[in-house]
């Protein structure tokens, strides 16, 4: 989510808890950008509630639940009452994404496809670097 919103960071560090099988079960990543640092904590080994929060000088956004579901989010702006939004029209979390893809294909919007690919590449580059930094090796390495 962080790379999707803010782009590729200037640098990133990752501290991982590595399981018996050599794979990270949880960890914290810090991503440095011009003017701010973003952090992410993830835990495959925990059943704790998920949420994400973006905090800035003029306000904040908080979403409870897994970021890939986004059932609702609350926006708080300095000097205003927070407002909560629930924009999902469907029960399944992926219907909106499928509709967007269908629209992109119908319009032959290859620019949107390329933008999505660029984001995916940026995310994978950050994740690959973080994995190697944490000493996590795959057989294919």
Tell where the protein language model's regions lie, with residue ranges.
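Contiguous beta-strand/loop segments that form the cofactor/metal-binding neighborhood of enzyme cores
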Residues: 1-69, 99-108
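Short, acidic/hydrophobic/Gly-rich beta-strand patch recurrent on exposed beta strands
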Residues: 53, 74-77
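Solvent-exposed strand-loop boundary residues in beta-sheet-rich modules
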Residues: 58, 77-79
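Surface-exposed loop/edge segments in extracytoplasmic proteins
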Residues: 80-84
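Active-site loop of classical SDR/Rossmann-like NAD(P)-dependent oxidoreductases
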Residues: 87-99, 115
């Amino acid at each position: 989510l962080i790379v999707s919103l803010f782009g590729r960071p200037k640098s990133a560090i990752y501290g991982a808890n590595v399981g018996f099988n050599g794979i990270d079960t949880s960890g914290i990543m810090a991503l440095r950008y011009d003017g701010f640092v973003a952090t992410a904590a993830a835990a495959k080994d925990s059943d704790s509630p998920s949420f994400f929060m973006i905090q800035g000088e003029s306000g904040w956004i908080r979403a409870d639940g897994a970021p890939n579901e986004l059932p609702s989010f609350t926006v708080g702006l300095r000097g205003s009452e927070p407002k909560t939004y629930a924009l999902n029209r469907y029960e399944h979390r992926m219907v909106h994404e499928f509709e967007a893809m269908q629209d992109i294909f119908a319009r032959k919007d290859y620019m949107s496809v390329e933008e999505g690919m660029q984001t995916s590449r940026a995310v994978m580059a950050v994740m690959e670097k973080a994995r190697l930094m944490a000493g996590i090796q795959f057989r294919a390495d």
